[in-house]
């Protein structure tokens, strides 16, 4: 709830009624992929040579799930629209205090978005894709 998730320096719950959805922590805190190592697969020798010095981490694309709740239909619509506007800014800095002080510097891709709303029109789930261009840059 309050204080669990911060987006662009704002408390997501108090600002937009947004909480982390299913699998949020697993997705954002998952292991990182490595960039391919430099290889030379020459026909002149058996196997291949690999340069293992100076390994680098690759960018990553993650899907995050959110829940958004309003106190009424009008409150829900206002919060939903404001949250959507925040995502449309492109740059989305996410901090989850239970994972430490690191800030995940993400870019909202606006693709593969799924959305579902309850029949009372006061609650929804949102699943959206983000890119983390440099997963090693998580400083404040």
Regions found by a protein language model. Give the residues of each.
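Extracellular/virion structural assembly segments
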Residues: 1-140
